[in-house]
């Protein structure tokens, strides 16, 4: 199905709806397709934030702010593929400076409501996690813990290091122990990931988990920014499903308008399944 056929199929699925309902739905879809996700990347100095972003995403990264690290305003980078954008926010890691951690707590409380996801990077050989644990439970807390995906970075530096072209069995065992430790300390909502950018290890699994962690409106825009090798069937189907569910949610919200006539509500409910199904089928047209 080419793009024009996809759009035609979707418009045909709306034929039984009143024009104002169709127009509102198309307006909401337009907002969705132009949605610009914001992903925070958190971690201590040298944890590998830049290398992970460059490995995951295909777009050109350009800074949109140039603020000194001593201020409460985090660095932002805008990533572009075609006409689509996402914003990456470089968030400082905690535990490196006691004087700064209080300031960082205020920064996080300010920024967390604006973020779709936080990738919290922890080096495979980092054992100083007491401050991280306290910060997670006290600052992130119950309200925002669903937005955090923990990522063990630089897994090739896990003991015993070899510098070879692949992880040893002993390293994989130690990484598994590290994953269990992080689950014990943080009790995260989402499974902990482990990656090595240098070895290109674990990135595909991480990309799939990242997409599952995002809110529905953010999955498709983020998928469009991923490096092609990470746009797996799992990733694409998750985005396709989320897009359909979002379209369905828009129809539900219109149907719930208090003054909407009962016959119009009945029509919306009658065509909902078909419209959602077609939206999933023509996802490639929109993204």
From Swiss-Prot:
Binding site for GTP: 43-50, 90-93, 156-159
InterPro entries given in the database record: GTP-bd, P-loop_NTPase
One Pfam family of this chain: MMR_HSR1
Record-linked SUPFAM superfamilies: P-loop containing nucleoside triphosphate hydrolases
Domain of life: Bacteria
UniProt-listed CDD domains: YfjP
Gene Ontology molecular function: GTP binding
Keyword GTP-binding: yes
Keyword terms: GTP-binding, Nucleotide-binding
Disulphides: none
Gene Ontology cellular component list: cytoplasm; cytosol
Protein name according to UniProt: Uncharacterized protein YkfA
Residues of the G domain: 48-138
Gene Ontology biological process terms in this record: tRNA methylation; tRNA wobble uridine modification
Protein's organism: Escherichia coli (strain K12)
Keyword Membrane among record annotations: no
Family the UniProt entry places it in: To E.coli YfjP and YeeP.
Gene, per the UniProt record: ykfA
């Amino acid at each position: 199905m080419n793009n024009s056929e996809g759009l035609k199929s979707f418009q045909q699925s709306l034929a039984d709806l009143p024009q104002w309902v169709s127009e509102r739905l198309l307006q909401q879809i337009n907002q969705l397709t132009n949605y610009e996700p914001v992903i925070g990347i958190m971690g201590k100095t040298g944890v590998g934030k830049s290398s992970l972003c460059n490995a995951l995403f295909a777009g050109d990264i350009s800074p949109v702010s140039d603020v000194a690290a001593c201020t409460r305003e985090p660095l932002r980078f805008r990533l572009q593929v075609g006409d689509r954008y996402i914003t990456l926010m470089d968030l400082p890691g905690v535990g490196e400076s006691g004087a700064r951690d209080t300031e960082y707590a205020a920064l996080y409380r300010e920024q967390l409501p604006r973020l779709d996801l936080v990738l919290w990077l922890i080096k495979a050989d980092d054992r100083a996690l007491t401050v991280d644990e306290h910060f997670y439970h006290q600052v992130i807390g119950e309200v925002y813990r669903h937005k955090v995906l923990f990522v063990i970075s630089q897994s090739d530096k896990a003991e015993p290091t070899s510098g070879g072209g692949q992880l040893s069995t002993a390293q994989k065992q130690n990484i598994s122990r590290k994953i269990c430790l992080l689950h014990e300390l943080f009790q995260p909502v989402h499974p902990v990931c482990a990656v090595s950018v240098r070895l290109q290890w674990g990135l595909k699994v991480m990309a799939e988990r990242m997409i599952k962690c995002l809110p529905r409106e953010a999955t498709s825009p983020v998928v469009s920014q991923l490096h092609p090798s990470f746009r797996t069937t799992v990733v694409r189907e998750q985005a396709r499903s989320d897009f359909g569910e979002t379209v369905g949610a828009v129809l539900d919200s219109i149907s719930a308008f208090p003054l909407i006539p009962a016959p119009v509500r009945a029509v919306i409910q009658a065509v909902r399944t078909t419209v959602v199904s077609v939206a999933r089928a023509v996802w490639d047209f929109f993204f």
